[in-house]
């Protein structure tokens, strides 16, 4: 050990004292993640409020961690939850098992399932980390109606999937805001 070693150590301490603080005040000031960040899942809706999920279970089959459970149900004219023949009657994502890989997003044929930038999913109760359909559904925007209700944007499911963006503009979804993002992400 050299004579000047303590002085070198104090030099590091003194130089650090005059630098800008890099500490983040986490719960009070939340960092906005990058747009490509894989956060909490969200089940999206059509512009009239019907669900995009058709209960095909492709997301559950694509999940390598077996974290997704989907049970499909059949739509009727009296109770219609999605434009197709089926809808996701029971939908669950187990965040104790989810690894955030995004393979479920790629597998979804209707772009019903997307990932938001929400990263706070920690909880002290294991049961609360199994998110149900009600927890994952996108909130209703102005002009949307709570399902079940008849198809408002067309006569068949092709009107929803082929002419979707045109129908969204006619339904009054503001420019720059999509049904997937909602008003909070359109402002960024």
From Swiss-Prot:
It catalyses: a quinone + NADH + 5 H(+)(in) = a quinol + NAD(+) + 4 H(+)(out). Binds 2 [4Fe-4S] clusters per subunit. [4Fe-4S] cluster 1 binds at residues 53, 56, 59, 108. Its cofactor is [4Fe-4S] cluster. Keywords: 4Fe-4S, Cell membrane, Iron, Iron-sulfur, Membrane, Metal-binding, NAD, Quinone, Repeat, Translocase, Ubiquinone. Residues 43-73, 89-118 form the 4Fe-4S ferredoxin-type domain. GO terms for molecular function: 4 iron, 4 sulfur cluster binding; iron ion binding; NADH:ubiquinone reductase (non-electrogenic) activity; quinone binding. The keyword Iron-sulfur applies. It is a peripheral membrane protein. The keyword Acetylation does not apply. Coiled coil: none annotated. It comes from the Bacteria. Its EC number is 7.1.1.-. One of its GO terms (cellular component) is plasma membrane. [4Fe-4S] cluster 2 binds at residues 63, 98, 101, 104. Gene3D superfamilies: 3.30.70.3270. NCBIfam families: NuoI (TIGR01971), PRK05888.1-3 (NF004537). NDH-1 shuttles electrons from NADH, via FMN and iron-sulfur (Fe-S) centers, to quinones in the respiratory chain. The immediate electron acceptor for the enzyme in this species is believed to be ubiquinone. Couples the redox reaction to proton translocation (for every two electrons transferred, four hydrogen ions are translocated across the cytoplasmic membrane), and thus conserves the redox energy in a proton gradient. This is NADH-quinone oxidoreductase subunit I. It comes from Saccharopolyspora erythraea (strain ATCC 11635 / DSM 40517 / JCM 4748 / NBRC 13426 / NCIMB 8594 / NRRL 2338). The lineage of its organism: Bacteria, Bacillati, Actinomycetota, Actinomycetes, Pseudonocardiales.
């Amino acid at each position: 050990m050299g004579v000047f070693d303590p002085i070198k150590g104090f030099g590091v301490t003194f130089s650090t004292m005059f630098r800008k603080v890099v500490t983040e005040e986490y719960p009070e000031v939340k960092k906005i993640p990058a747009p490509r960040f894989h956060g909490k899942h969200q089940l999206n809706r059509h512009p009239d409020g019907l669900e995009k999920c058709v209960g095909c279970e492709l997301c559950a089959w694509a999940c390598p961690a077996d974290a997704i459970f989907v049970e499909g149900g059949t739509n009727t004219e009296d109770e219609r939850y999605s434009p197709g023949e089926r809808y996701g009657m029971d939908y669950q994502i187990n965040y104790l098992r989810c690894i955030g890989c995004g393979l479920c997003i790629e597998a979804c044929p209707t772009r019903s399932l997307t990932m938001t930038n929400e990263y706070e999913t920690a909880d002290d109760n294991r049961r609360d980390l199994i998110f149900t359909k009600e927890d994952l559904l996108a909130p209703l925007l102005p002009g949307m109606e709570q399902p079940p209700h008849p198809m408002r944007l067309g006569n068949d499911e092709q009107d929803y999937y082929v002419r979707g963006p045109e129908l969204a503009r006619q339904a009054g979804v503001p420019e720059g805001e999509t049904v997937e993002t909602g008003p909070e992400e359109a402002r960024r």
